[in-house]
A protein has these predicted regions:
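Acidic, polar ligand-binding/catalytic clefts
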Residues: 76, 87-158, 224-226, 231-244, ...
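Periplasmic-binding protein-like
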Residues: 53-57, 134-150, 222-266, 286-291, ...
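Export/targeting segments at the very N-terminus of extracytoplasmic proteins
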Residues: 285-332, 366-369, 383-387, 468
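Extracytoplasmic small-molecule ligand-binding "clamshell" domains
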Residues: 24-122, 128, 195-200, 263
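Extended ligand-binding regions for polar small-molecule ligands
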Residues: 24-42, 69-81, 147-173, 221, ...
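Catalytic and substrate-binding regions of cell-wall glycan-acting enzymes that process beta-1,4-linked
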Residues: 251-252, 393-459
Length: 469
């Protein structure tokens, strides 16, 4: 086993526009600190269209040169449209600036981009001070998504008292609030909303629903159907409409009338290519999928090793649930598991890695966990001790380095900064470099461990109550 980690915090720096259009890898990525609102004339003068994109992999992901984000094909087509009558030296290049969905319009208003492409519905009440495009997708309903084998629903009223997991800034939030007002009039229990951790995007929540970690979520119909093709245990309850269908749109600066008119002309004639999801389906169908780490048998396994995880977690100042999450990903909490390259045991540590931290016997659970905890702490101390990293991102970088090697992760952080991404943030930022250079393997590894940690952390009180008995 050779495992390592990556992580990053939030800081977008200026990336110089230059560089020719890379048709194979899709629109380039960039960031800008410009505060001046720009219209089409300024865009043509600079030869760069700065597009603020939703940082989720569903919206703007690219894996080893293959676009899997739904906005990639549209933005590439927009670039061709803008350059249709231009001479070679006057061509405009689209540059992507990935941001959290809830930050897109604010960044647009500050002049940090020329166009915002969220790829999802925005709350209409939050849309002000910007120009709004014609529909990118019209009449988009929000649908309930659950797991096959669990109860299905046909009416909104049946959701009374149920919990729905939503990502930050989900378009379903206001709709559920309106439904709850109607339920209150009927003296029915409200729908409860669990706002998930910001390290999770819509695709992550859907994966956790498929695993049974979350039971229900609500997403846009195109997103639900897209991911159901690669997550076959998802169940889409198409009869349950959450709110009224709305339009997915793009947004420009308030005064960018020429750019808005050009975007609207482009959208009026745009047709998505029939094979636009070919790479997405090929890549994601073979990815590791998380399981429910808190099913009955898994809880029993966790209880059996909980004491040793807590002991060595405390010794190395690592949350024991981080160790538990890593152990579940590596061995499904099976101390007898055998891997490749000599990796073995609960943590799938290799003898060479154990020897580096002074542990010679990893055949038993105690030594196996001790070696892994020490190794994680060594990586953290030598490479990721900066106070600029928050603890969640620090742990993500440690895991990435555990999987890839610390030096490689540090090089990825440097490349992220060079491109205007946030080198102190792993999730959705530095992970983009890993996806480009290595593929989904290390990104999937870190994300899976993170999901298991979040699943355990939701049940921390009950898991630690068991520990005190």
């Amino acid at each position: 086993m050779q495992r390592f980690l990556l992580i990053v915090s939030l800081m977008f720096s200026l990336l110089m526009a230059a560089a020719a259009h890379a048709a194979v890898s899709g629109p380039a990525q960039a960031s800008s600190t410009s505060k001046l609102p720009r219209d089409l004339a300024q865009v043509r003068s600079s030869k760069v269209l700065r597009v603020l994109v939703n940082q989720s992999r569903n919206s703007s992901g690219e894996i080893k040169g293959e676009p899997v984000g739904i906005e990639y094909h549209r933005l590439r087509a927009l670039e061709h449209f803008l350059n249709g009558r231009e001479r070679q030296g006057d061509l405009i290049q689209v540059k992507l600036i990935p941001r959290a969905k809830e930050q897109l319009l604010g960044a647009l208003q500050r002049g940090e981009g020329d166009l915002a492409a969220p790829g999802e519905l925005l709350d209409p009440a939050q849309v002000s001070g910007v120009g709004v495009s014609a529909p990118v997708l019209d009449n988009v309903p929000l649908l309930l998504v659950g797991r096959k084998g669990e109860r299905s629903f046909s009416r909104v009223e049946q959701l009374s008292g149920r919990t729905i997991a939503l990502t930050t800034a989900s378009g379903a939030g206001p709709a559920i609030q309106a439904i709850n007002q109607q339920l209150a009039l009927r003296k029915r229990a409200p729908i409860k909303v669990e706002w998930v951790d910001p390290t999770l995007a819509v695709e992550d929540v859907l994966e956790m629903v498929q695993a049974g970690i979350y039971h229900l979520t609500v997403v846009e119909r195109p997103i639900a159907l897209r991911w159901a093709r690669v997550m076959p245990r998802l169940r889409v309850d198409s009869k349950v409409l959450i709110g009224q269908p709305q339009a997915v749109r793009w947004y420009v600066g308030r005064e960018a009338d020429q750019l808005l008119a050009t975007v609207d002309r482009f959208l009026a004639g745009y047709r998505a290519p029939e094979n636009q999801d070919a790479a997405f389906e090929r890549i994601y169908r073979r990815q590791y999928r998380v399981h429910n780490p808190l099913a009955r048998q898994e809880r029993q396994r966790l209880q059996a090793v909980r004491g040793v995880l807590q002991k060595h977690g405390e010794a190395q100042q690592i949350d024991w649930l981080n160790l538990a999450a890593l152990a579940f990903k590596e061995s499904t909490l099976n101390p007898a598991a055998r891997g490749v390259g000599g990796a073995h045991g609960l943590m799938q540590i290799t003898p060479s890695a154990a020897q580096r931290v002074g542990v010679s016997n990893t055949a038993n659970v105690d030594g196996n966990v001790q070696a892994s905890a020490r190794y994680l702490a060594l990586i953290r101390r030598k490479f990721f001790a900066s106070p600029q990293l928050n603890e969640r991102e620090r742990m993500a970088f440690v895991l990435a380095a555990y999987n890839l090697g610390p030096e490689r992760v540090q090089a990825m952080r440097a490349e992220a900064r060079r491109r205007g991404l946030n080198g102190n943030q792993w999730f959705f930022q530095t992970e983009r470099i890993a996806m480009e250079q290595v593929g989904m393997g290390p990104v999937n590894f870190v994300n899976s461990v993170n999901k298991y940690f979040l699943a355990f952390n939701r049940e921390r009180a009950s898991l630690e109550r068991v520990a005190r008995r």
